[in-house]
């Protein structure tokens, strides 16, 4: 049974429902939690959140959680963000700005640089990203759009191995299956390998 999902966008960026509306819908589905992950500031085309917006959203999440707790409602919002992975593998926002988050979904959106580079360069950049202590979930790992564009070249076996190594050291690194019918990314062929490496899979809409 699906208990929740961690990669969800609200009207604060490019989603179609408010935070409260999404929380209500999740509760109606019987979910135990909902993770918010609006776009980060660099992705202005999708109304990415400024650092001040991030703080405001964090306060809204905290207020909703406190209200449910006071009423005995067994439901929790997690405050995350879909932080862009930049071309060198660094993450959008400063470390301090990301530290207020419950989770970070790291994703590549600035594709022109990535599609021009070879597999080794892209793999190194992704590994740099996942090694950041604030990084939690690798979002739509190849950036592909089914029927639209191929993903960028990357050695996902190497990336998943490194995630597994970090998990063995006590960190939590998760790979996403983005279940949008336009993405289905992570490709199913890597799911067993992720499990073998000790990398949890997060299924998100």
Please provide the spans of the model-predicted regions.
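Extended substrate/RNA-proximal surfaces in nucleic-acid metabolism proteins
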Residues: 1-2, 44-170
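Histidine-centered catalytic micro-motifs
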Residues: 3-15, 36-41, 137-143
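Active-site mouth loops of central-metabolism enzymes
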Residues: 5-21, 111-117
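Divalent metal-coordination and catalytic microenvironments
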Residues: 7, 26, 38, 77, ...
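Alpha-helical scaffold segments that flank or form the walls of functional sites
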Residues: 20-35, 59-68
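Glycine-centered short loops/turns at secondary-structure junctions
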Residues: 30, 170-172, 198
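Short acidic/histidine-rich active-site segments
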Residues: 180, 199-205
